[in-house]
Amino acid sequence: MDSLPRLTSVLTLLFSGLWHLGLTATNYNCDDPLASLLSPMAFSSSSDLTGTHSPAQLNWRVGTGGWSPADSNAQQWLQMDLGNRVEITAVATQGRYGSSDWVTSYSLMFSDTGRNWKQYKQEDSIWTFAGNMNADSVVHHKLLHSVRARFVRFVPLEWNPSGKIGMRVEVYGCSYKSDVADFDGRSSLLYRFNQKLMSTLKDVISLKFKSMQGDGVLFHGEGQRGDHITLELQKGRLALHLNLGDSKARLSSSLPSATLGSLLDDQHWHSVLIERVGKQVNFTVDKHTQHFRTKGETDALDIDYELSFGGIPVPGKPGTFLKKNFHGCIENLYYNGVNIIDLAKRRKHQIYTGNVTFSCSEPQIVPITFVNSSGSYLLLPGTPQIDGLSVSFQFRTWNKDGLLLSTELSEGSGTLLLSLEGGILRLVIQKMTERVAEILTGSNLNDGLWHSVSINARRNRITLTLDDEAAPPAPDSTWVQIYSGNSYYFGGCPDNLTDSQCLNPIKAFQGCMRLIFIDNQPKDLISVQQGSLGNFSDLHIDLCSIKDRCLPNYCEHGGSCSQSWTTFYCNCSDTSYTGATCHNSIYEQSCEVYRHQGNTAGFFYIDSDGSGPLGPLQVYCNITEDKIWTSVQHNNTELTRVRGANPEKPYAMALDYGGSMEQLEAVIDGSEHCEQEVAYHCRRSRLLNTPDGTPFTWWIGRSNERHPYWGGSPPGVQQCECGLDESCLDIQHFCNCDADKDEWTNDTGFLSFKDHLPVTQIVITDTDRSNSEAAWRIGPLRCYGDRRFWNAVSFYTEASYLHFPTFHAEFSADISFFFKTTALSGVFLENLGIKDFIRLEISSPSEITFAIDVGNGPVELVVQSPSLLNDNQWHYVRAERNLKETSLQVDNLPRSTRETSEEGHFRLQLNSQLFVGGTSSRQKGFLGCIRSLHLNGQKMDLEERAKVTSGVRPGCPGHCSSYGSICHNGGKCVEKHNGYLCDCTNSPYEGPFCKKEVSAVFEAGTSVTYMFQEPYPVTKNISLSSSAIYTDSAPSKENIALSFVTTQAPSLLLFINSSSQDFVVVLLCKNGSLQVRYHLNKEETHVFTIDADNFANRRMHHLKINREGRELTIQMDQQLRLSYNFSPEVEFRVIRSLTLGKVTENLGLDSEVAKANAMGFAGCMSSVQYNHIAPLKAALRHATVAPVTVHGTLTESSCGFMVDSDVNAVTTVHSSSDPFGKTDEREPLTNAVRSDSAVIGGVIAVVIFIIFCIIGIMTRFLYQHKQSHRTSQMKEKEYPENLDSSFRNEIDLQNTVSECKREYFI
């Protein structure tokens, strides 16, 4: 199979070479001077300084010494008639001899007839040639691509400002021979085969054509089995229909196999090459090639009897054709090496000729181009005061709006306006401001095609005809009497025209017109050009310079292209991309980036190559505290049972991951580690059998290769995990299943060799014996570790740099990275070409500069930051250049943008190495760090390159200095080599950014008591020394925070007591007001009541209490409710315990607190924090190791679910950070094979289980209520031995509440 693409490539190169060889002149040294032998009469010009023809050959010194026009302006030109079509390869110019007259820049135009000129272009833009700097030196230009023409025209653009236009010219080339056939739209050529059937496995068809119309068949052939090949013009584009043996695909109903080209009805030559090998086809029109695979059942194209050129004749009906025939000329027509036109000229018996001639007859049609949307117009005279009016012309444009015609009618008839508005043709006759008549017709007339318009008015009837179809008459025009005027303004109005001779309510027309008739008389536009007829401004006469800016389509990633006369637009709405050319992905490149943005676990789309071609892939981002896992699900993650498979009839299952293999490879290659769990459950079903034997089961990986090793084993070793551990059931085998036992067992493990992942298929061959059965499960592809986002290097000498291969980005370039520095300036990166270059640098402490040159001169964009950028913090830079704009973005500052010029060079051509962190001159080097450098979505592996480069170190420390604020709610940022993590030890929250609330539902009897003691970690894997748990048992301040939802009042929320009878209490009074009670230093109890609302109202409330020394503040729901100063030297003595909910000990509570405590707290509480301690989090997460006691039922839940619901009902919300759960059972899951009996049995079991649970809970509740005090004592005795003895004894608080309390109401 691999040999076919190779053969295709070889044949394609061979055929392309032969085609170009056939079309190139036979003289390989095609550089002969062609103008030096011409007579003076072969030269003509727009005007001449002396009024007579002046020979303008190179080095001419006689007479005036060359050509100069009468006036030096942009309308002048010099042309020569070379006598016949020749191949032109170079040009040269001089100034006029002995003068100060020379041209400094010019353009070239070519023509076969001296009419309908074509401008010379390079890079799809009108090319400007550099001219002379004096009168005598010769400036020679080799054409990038040769031109075949008879007439050449030099158009001066700029000249010596101290002189005038002056030229002596030469063109170089050689003779050009070709075979041409002219088709008049009713004729064809038939090439009859020598045998009945022509069957070919490969074809090469080449030709050149010029067409007079937008539709017509160039050639056609078909066979009886449905084979056909047809090339036809459709609305100015070439459509190729090709089918190989598919009888269902008929030409009349099938869509084209490929469509190429645009504006091919411009009466200029266009080249076509069709190369086919089997079903692989290359279709080339001019310089654009489309490769496709054709439909069909075979590789051979079977054509019966003949090929027809110019039309599709109907068998048995001479002169009748199935489709519109071709009208124009075809040149050098070759079919598989056969020169068809040469055979026809020599009247060979294989050719049957219709009304075909062998020279190209072309009508002398003169088009004009309206260039400027504000100043272009054409004024033509008419015959005034005729009863009626007759005007017709053809136009083509890309603009939806524009004035086509304005004329003031005689005899007070009003003004006639014809315009395009929204692509619709609109005819209006108005008197003053009153609209007398209006006709609308057509749609989408800005499609770039030629459209014919005719206006006829006689007496009181107006007829508007568009493309030979008459529009419905105006309903209110029956009484209009029209008399023709004497001036007709086409395209626009003069700027200095102030009267009603020309009205233009919209912008001027930009486009082409031709075949203008007024009063049924054609208008000679060459006379207009010569100044003898009418007037004009900003017109190109004798050429139509329309250009299809959507060919090729520069809208990327499937964006749709539309255009106006001057630019193109991209519609990105149906893509996953954005930007002027749909270049930028709307998705991030990895789960790591989503995590960095503050997202939590969920489904996301990632675009691994950013602006590259791969496209987005849906994944699950499991964003945990330590690793960020990327999971890619496939279509079969359930346990699947297999029976009846054997080597002759194997079982195979392909896995679909919802994306291409390239997308999956990008995810894997961009990760530090990837794995897939594979499980094989077996009963008398062998897996691998022996390391040297043929395996019974294998899997297919990314390269479509078989892999006989199983999970837990390294590649190349035909074993399972138990074989490496020497723990298999049978020591003679290396997998449990290879023991071939008549009972269920399994081999389960992880595949983690990235070059083989993902698993794309599994094949099983040993489940066809008696009692033989297997069940398999392959988990999702899971990866962690972003090798792109944290890939960083440090530059510590100005002369150091990293170099990479040349950055190839001709049409679109985007560069993004992070940097941090303390230097004043330095170059981030630079890439040079011969003239082009691209450079990004920090040019001052507060400025980033992006400079680029694509050949039109440097463009520089600067973003200035209001704050310093050399602050040793990470900053983000993104620079982009495309065919629409150049832009620079720094952090979140306003983007700097510059529109790209529509003309001139547009390819960015670089050829040096890419320098990162410096320049090729080793000057202006960057000092600092660069991270996550991407060019057009591709990661640059900075760290790997830095390992072998002096002056550069891999990695860059100090992420927390920039990203520490991402850790919320008291979380601490911890540095890692490849990033950072948030340590939530001291926070009542959890999650990757300490933003996830830890909350629980309390019942009325629930109590959570935290005993203060030596520092104890409440987060796993955090050492005691690194734990910042509060250690001072005699604090001088309190920072208390909690959130709650309840409907119960009174309620006790929080109780803090000390061994010296000090306490702080937070409770809800009976009326729902919140009360905070402070008793410190044996003072009277301070009671602070906030009764602004009933806080037992099923809504979430947030309380913050802060005391530092004497100053106390209380916030409720983010509003400051109270501020108070205690007496001097107030402090909280040694704290004993903190209780949430009901206080179960006998602590001698005062009456108010006792009332609230009797009710306890029923509701939901979350985010509880006392200084650096999170007691609720400790109870829920680390109850076995933290000094915390729980009485009653405490159920973890989200308080958000309790709002506006029954808070007294205990609701448990189970969540999983990874929806793709794993199963590792010794036997297959019972639901692998579903049955009704299993479902019914399961329901019964669940009901019985629930009943027993209810009985158990009731029994436990009654027991706990009776033994609560005893349990509290026992719990304290279970603390670790290293606790202070003062906390091992039970301490009863004495009732020191004064009879005289201070109470504060807010």
UniProtKB/Swiss-Prot annotation:
Cytoplasmic membrane side: 1259-1306
SUPFAM superfamilies in the cross-refs: Concanavalin A-like lectins/glucanases, EGF/Laminin, Fibrinogen C-terminal domain-like, Galactose-binding domain-like
Disulfide bonds: 30-174, 329-360, 512-544, 550-561, 555-570, 572-582, 929-956, 960-973, 967-982, 984-994, 1164-1199
Pfam families in the record: F5_F8_type_C, Laminin_G_2
Subcellular location as annotated: Membrane
Domain Laminin G-like: 180-360, 367-544, 791-956, 1013-1199
GO biological process: cell adhesion
GO cellular component annotations of the record: membrane
Domain Fibrinogen C-terminal: 584-790
Domain EGF-like residues, every copy: 546-583, 957-995
PANTHER family per record: CONTACTIN-ASSOCIATED PROTEIN-LIKE 5, PIKACHURIN-LIKE PROTEIN
Record's protein name: Contactin-associated protein-like 5
UniProt organism field: Homo sapiens (Human)
